[in-house]
Amino acid sequence: LDMLKSDGYKAIFIATGVWNPKTLNVKGETLGNVHYAIDYLKAPKSYNLGERVVVIGAGNVAMDAARTAKRNGADTYVLYRKSFEDMPATKVEIEEAKEDGVKFELYKAPLEIYEDGVKYIQTERVISEDGRVSFKTLEGSEGVFKCDSIIVAISQAPRTNIVSSSRDLSTDKYGLVVTDEKGITTLNGVFASGDVVSGPKTVVEAVANSKKVAHAIDEFCKNN
């Protein structure tokens, strides 16, 4: 960004998306039967997943990975620690996954990955007196879900070469760029929009937000 500014650009727009998969941080995640959805979806035919596949996560990318694995012949399950209502995936994506034959294992949180499955602990929904919903693990409810391969799909984060290496460009705890409603970042003349700001969303949302930011960039260039 500093080099672009020194080259005379008035405004810079960051829309690099999120391409680094987030990890589960559980024992066994480096085993050879563990893959990341963002990588798998680039070339699914090149993966030999076996007969039974578990996708960990419940966003749109998780649904895409599960449906793709199912269409390629695997008996596919989505493992999620909450309920259908709590899934970040759109209702359309969830319903289409069901129609494709994807099965769902809910209220199960992964603890460890083995060569032949995922160790999990069951969870339950808890509603506090003020109506807030949370989930707690149930002691003694551990089990192992047998599978040949695991696909991790618990969201993505921005690549660090642009975002975290830029001085004065604020990011949140997830590594996403902080902006106002016009896409203005904490670095003068730098704007951002799309998944690099919001995290993984739909293309429609990214395009709609970027149109708003384009107007802000135009206004900035006219006044500077």
Predicted regions and their residues:
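General small-molecule cofactor/ligand-binding pocket signal
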Residues: 35, 103-105, 119, 191
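Rossmann-like NAD(P)H-binding beta-loop-alpha module
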Residues: 48-74
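Cofactor-binding loop segments of dinucleotide-utilizing enzymes, especially the Rossmann-like FAD-
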Residues: 58, 81-83, 195
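A conserved FAD-binding loop/helix module that cradles the flavin
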Residues: 193-223
